[in-house]
Amino acid sequence: MLEVKFYDTVDDSLLKFAVIISQSNGKWVFCKHKERDTYEAPGGHREVGEDILETAKRELQEETGAIQFNIKPICVYSVTGKNSVNENGEETFGLLCFAEIREFSGQLDSEMEKVVLMDELPQNWTYPLIQPKLIEKYMQIEKQSYSQIQLSAKQTIEYIKNTIKPGMNLLEIRKLCEEKLLELGADSFWYWDVGAFVFAGDETCVSVSGKQYVTSDRVIGNNEIITIDLSPQVGNIWGDYARTIIVENGMVVEDIGLIENPEWKSGLQMEEKLHAELLRFATKETTFEKLYYHMNEFIVENGFVNLDFMGNLGHSIVKTKGDRVYIEKGNMTKLGDVKYFTFEPHIAFPDSKYGYKKENIYYFIENGLMEL
């Protein structure tokens, strides 16, 4: 029986193999050997004097024909027990990596017959006692990474709530938010290099692409409505989180029920209602289009309008901006076919100068939809 273990690090000299879990355009990348009818993740032996990450790059290129890709180490794995590459059964170590492949050459310089892109993991594995466990570990680490970067966004909103005061301008608020995101682990910002989209007052009705966004120098008053939309990332792992903040009598009002302005209170209550309706309505089989129609009808039935400049209500969380799919008309992708998606209705009362926004990332577990 083979035993697979995982380590953060070991002595470099122990690393004899590299396995590269790979994806391209949201699909798993697997290889089929010329002499087998099974599938495997690319990988292989380290050559003498070779840097282990170079081993991973070389094996990826040889076995998949990848020519444009990003690759990163995930962790160290070990296998104990006799197998085709370990006659003695002692513990052997390898580097587990992840690669996002952007382009293939179409030619393979290896014993592999072909490369296959799959929506689901294969049933017929070449190494059924090893590689499924490696992929399970990768998925566990990836989820932790998404949770951590999203947590940094949530903590940044809590930080700025305790910092905002009358007299501050929006440029200062943006700067503080972006600095806090970086302090909490983000290394960059995925949406047009802007970490915090900040609007106040009648600007909260503005819906604009990040490409055209310019932060105003508007000054916060004693009674103010502010929307902040955060887009941190670490590597190619995204966070996406937005909240509407109310300032009354010079203080941030934490409890929606304590907001004095009736219009602002109703707007934030509607955002809560929308997210509750999402959790009630959405299933893995619900298409993005069906959710689009249902939620837009729900918005109108409750006396509000959708302010989004594209008319959509959210998007999938991916690793490249151009790969996103949206909660929009015509998108027949099922919610359960993506790992994570955002729900971010930007709404207002008709003809009002104030807009409201609340954004979370959601994902499915066996029992239903969960907030990340």
Regions found by a protein language model. Name each.
Residues 28-29, 103-107, 252-253:
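Short helix-loop capping/hinge motifs at secondary-structure junctions, enriched
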Residues 18-22, 362-363:
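Short beta-strand scaffold segments in enzyme catalytic cores
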Residues 12-14, 87-93, 218-220, 354:
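A generic structural micro-feature
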Residues 23-62:
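Conserved Nudix-box catalytic region and its N-terminal flanking loop in Nudix hydrolases
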Residues 141-372:
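Active-site neighborhoods and metal-handling regions in enzymes and metal-associated proteins
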Residues 46-70, 77-133:
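Unchanged
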Residues 1-19:
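Acidic, metal-coordinating catalytic segment for phosphate/diphosphate chemistry
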Residues 17-19, 28, 194-196:
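Short glycine-rich loop/turn motifs
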